[in-house]
């Protein structure tokens, strides 16, 4: 008589691991879909900078093959790099996405805003931004902010509530457990959503390399007339001129972040490809904002002060 033998060995366990970029992409797409499902009129802040370009790319993947189900919004200070504005417009046209532009210069011309003595306009963006959000009845606003950029952004939630004045209260934030996001709000309030909050600058560049994402040319090494101020190379432009004691030099530089010409510094670099930028960023010990943004050096709490008033 034959006796059936029972296999007492457990079946082999099959595990599948996502690499870091896959995990970050999956989280970001989940956040984008969650916001679109929960809110009525979301909008994406799109400047043409690398972070907003990545968020837009993620949104396209999240809803492919359908169109991106929300519009883009940019606050144009009048001090933006021309190359970035051209890229912004071309990208919106290529993806067939509506682009709304809030114009700081218009606010200055009609007296609603006053030009700052130092000539910079970064802090002047808040009023046009909040007006555009209210005028468009946007209840959710996507942004490309990341926690590794600044200590104020490091403590902000992925879904961050703004009150009826557009203000952020860092002492009154909601808990976020795992992938559970609370978007509840009343009429007049809105929520800022940051899908790549957990990404680092290096993650962004590695993702750009993997996905072959196109960026403005300013992110790569090019020769430009610059002058040294406050430890940064500032570009010579119509809104940023050297003082009498500052010398103009022609140097090979690139931009790690593309804010206003009047407050954004370049870094010396020979990186002309994404792979070369990845290697450069991997060796860096300063965040891009800490290294190149004069507007963040006004005070230790410069970013938090602006965010409390409604800034990005």
Annotate each language-model stretch with its function.
Residues 2-312:
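Nucleotide-activated chemistry modules centered on ATP-dependent adenylation/adenylyltransferase
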